[in-house]
Amino acid sequence: MAAPLCVKVEFGGGAELLFDGVKKHQVALPGQEEPWDIRNLLVWIKKNLLKERPELFIQGDSVRPGILVLINDADWELLGELDYQLQDQDSILFISTLHGG
């Protein structure tokens, strides 16, 4: 069984508006059968943090195109994207690159 994890989740570039304007969250993820990965984290975020218009953040089982994801300041594409296994004290930053004009 995977141990509980504490991670920092941040939202920027306007994405924080979907989370009641709160940019930084200290998240305690409970222990579960399988290790926590980004895919599981997104499900948890949708259930526990996302306050409105989930279609602007989630598409299928991933983030919408136009949302940049950084894990410990590195592009998630370099780390396995949805399959990246979270470690205790990881920092995950979601930045919306889509802006109205």
From Swiss-Prot:
UniProt-listed GO biological process terms: protein urmylation; tRNA thio-modification; tRNA wobble uridine modification
Entry's Gene Ontology molecular function annotations: sulfur carrier activity
Cytoplasm as UniProt keyword: yes
Gene Ontology CC entries for this record: cytosol
Intracellular or extracellular location(s): Cytoplasm
This protein's pathway: tRNA modification; 5-methoxycarbonylmethyl-2-thiouridine-tRNA biosynthesis
Modified residues (1-thioglycine): 101
Signal peptide (UniProt feature, chain positions): none
Record bears the keyword Cell cycle: no
UniProt entry keywords in alphabetical sequence: Cytoplasm, Isopeptide bond, tRNA processing, Ubl conjugation pathway
Function: Acts as a sulfur carrier required for 2-thiolation of mcm(5)S(2)U at tRNA wobble positions of cytosolic tRNA(Lys), tRNA(Glu) and tRNA(Gln). Serves as sulfur donor in tRNA 2-thiolation reaction by being thiocarboxylated (-COSH) at its C-terminus by MOCS3. The sulfur is then transferred to tRNA to form 2-thiolation of mcm(5)S(2)U. Also acts as a ubiquitin-like protein (UBL) that is covalently conjugated via an isopeptide bond to lysine residues of target proteins such as MOCS3, ATPBD3, CTU2, USP15 and CAS.
Record family assignment: Belongs to the URM1 family.
Protein name: Ubiquitin-related modifier 1
Gene: Urm1
